[in-house]
């Protein structure tokens, strides 16, 4: 079931999805679609939507209807309505896989026409872990450059969850052009100063935030003109059938901000 909450485009509205822009505005710009799968992925995409790019479409896909309705994104897809009745996957990846298979036609419609599809997934649960490989396969078969940015559970989480994540990542890599895996344990190194007071909720928010930053950064490179021109063809050359990749974050300010950010990125624990 597809739940579309996007508004129609009006002159002067720079926040509309690309599919709603006038043809002369959209021409020559790659169509990028970001799909958040499961609870963690949907949370990450909800964060992205608050700072949405005008030429990117955002989707949340989940088996948990209550969580899905709380997601503030342009498009929402309830996976496996007949199978799960909107009650979630019970942390069972096979149920997540079956839910995605049931909703295959809705997923195909979602990725149709996309030049590039990002998947944001928090691995280890049922929906994200089980559904992501199915969704990635559908996206890649549509002809889109398909990139997955996934998080791996913290080491202190249940062993079953960690095993589910490993199995899911192993399956997902066969259906994407590029797979960026973020080990959540390394996020703690980014927050060493506050490690003793770092709560579980803050840890999860940080994991969602890193998914957000990774996808948003790549999307901005090909949609926002900069001092150094990087077009979609350049990005496709780098990411097409690239396999495993790594994400690093660096920040800088002042006159030498680019150099400072690059140095920080090379030392990033991610």
Sequence positions of predicted segments:
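Tubulin/FtsZ superfamily GTPase core signature
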Residues: 1-270
């Amino acid at each position: 079931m597809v739940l579309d909450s996007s508004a129609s485009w009006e002159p002067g509205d720079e926040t509309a999805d690309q599919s709603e822009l006038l043809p002369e505005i959209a021409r020559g710009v790659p169509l990028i679609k970001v799909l958040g799968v499961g609870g963690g992925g949907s949370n990450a995409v909800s964060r992205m939507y608050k700072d949405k790019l005008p030429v990117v479409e955002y989707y949340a896909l989940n088996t948990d209807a209550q969580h899905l309705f709380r997601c503030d994104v342009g498009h929402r897809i309830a996976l496996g309505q007949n199978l799960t009745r909107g009650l979630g996957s019970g942390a069972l990846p096979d149920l997540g896989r079956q839910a995605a298979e049931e909703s295959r036609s809705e997923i195909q419609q979602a990725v149709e026409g996309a030049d590039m599809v990002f998947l944001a997934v928090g691995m280890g649960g049922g929906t994200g872990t089980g559904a992501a490989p199915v969704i990635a396969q559908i996206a890649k078969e549509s002809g889109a450059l398909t990139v997955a940015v996934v998080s791996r559970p913290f080491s202190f989480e249940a062993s079953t969850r960690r095993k589910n994540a490993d199995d899911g990542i192993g399956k997902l890599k066969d259906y994407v052009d590029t797979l960026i895996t973020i080990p959540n344990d390394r996020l703690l190194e980014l927050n060493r100063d506050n490690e003793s007071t770092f709560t579980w909720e803050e840890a999860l928010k940080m994991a969602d935030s890193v998914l957000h930053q990774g996808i948003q950064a790549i999307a901005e490179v090909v949609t926002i003109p900069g001092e150094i021109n990087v077009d979609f063809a350049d990005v496709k050359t780098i990411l097409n059938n690239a396999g495993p990749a790594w994400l690093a974050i660096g920040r800088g300010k002042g006159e030498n901000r680019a150099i400072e950010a690059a140095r920080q990125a090379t030392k990033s624990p991610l």
